[in-house]
Structure formats: C-alpha cells, structure tokens
C-alpha cells in the first residue's frame, strides 16, 4: 500500500459537520484495510485568496496508508460533497507521523501562554504572602 497526504477544506458554514466528515472518511480508509498515521483538524483559517467568494475555510489534514481504491473513493466523496470546497491528495514516500509545523507552532504558543499564566499566578501568590 502507498502513503498519501490528504488536505481538504470545508465551507466555513459547515464547520459543525467536520467531525462527522472526518469519522466517515477515516472509516472508509480503515474499512479498506488502510491505516491513518496522522489526523489534524486545523480549524477555520484565512484563505490565501478567495474561493467561491469565501475568505475562510475549515482545514483538515490526513496522512494515510491505503490502497488506490480507497483513495479513489475518497476523491469521489470529496468531489460530490458540496461542503468540501477544495481537496488535495499527494502521494508520499514514507508515513508521516510527527506533528505538522502548524500544529507545533500552535502547541508552542499554548505552552508559552500556560507558562506565563503560571508565572503570573505564582507572582501574585508570592505578593499576597509578603504583606
């Protein structure tokens, strides 16, 4: 089986349907004896240029190992689902399991924010005890 990286963009008004879509698409891959190596829901993001007069879309990234029939079925599902405004399927040489740069940056920002919140909470507690 070959490895693929799949990115699809969902209409921003249909964001609440994304978890169901992810479940349906991952179910189709696993039913065809495929493996999902990475699944990232990037959320609603700004588009580089307007698509169908839209400026935002909900992004989802999948890295999978699947037979060609499963990928063909997935592409057909993308094509006939009106909520999916764009999709891209690329073949890769190896399975990618590490977090994408977008998720890494988001995690680092969250960690810095939590560290800052902990430091300010510690400082306020220390200031209260000195009085």
From Swiss-Prot:
Gene Ontology BP annotations: translation
Biased composition (Acidic residues): 120-131
GO molecular function: small ribosomal subunit rRNA binding; structural constituent of ribosome
Lineage of origin: Bacteria, Pseudomonadati, Pseudomonadota, Gammaproteobacteria, Enterobacterales
Chain's role: Binds together with bS18 to 16S ribosomal RNA.
Record-given protein name: Small ribosomal subunit protein bS6
Matches recorded under PROSITE patterns: RIBOSOMAL_S6
CDD domains according to UniProt: bS6 (cd00473)
A Pfam family of this chain: Ribosomal_S6
């Amino acid at each position: 089986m070959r490895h693929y990286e799949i990115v699809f963009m969902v209409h921003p008004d249909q964001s609440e349907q994304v978890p169901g879509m992810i479940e349906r698409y991952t179910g189709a891959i696993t039913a065809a004896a495929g493996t999902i190596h990475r699944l990232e829901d990037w959320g609603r993001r700004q588009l580089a240029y307007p698509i169908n007069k839209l400026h935002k879309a909900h992004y989802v990234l999948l890295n999978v190992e699947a037979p060609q029939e499963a990928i063909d079925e997935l592409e057909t599902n993308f094509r006939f689902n009106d909520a999916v405004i764009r999709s891209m399927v690329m073949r890769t040489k190896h399975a990618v399991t590490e977090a994408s740069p977008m998720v890494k940056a988001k995690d680092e920002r969250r960690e810095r924010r939590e560290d800052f919140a902990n430091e300010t909470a510690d400082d306020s507690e220390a200031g209260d005890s000195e009085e």
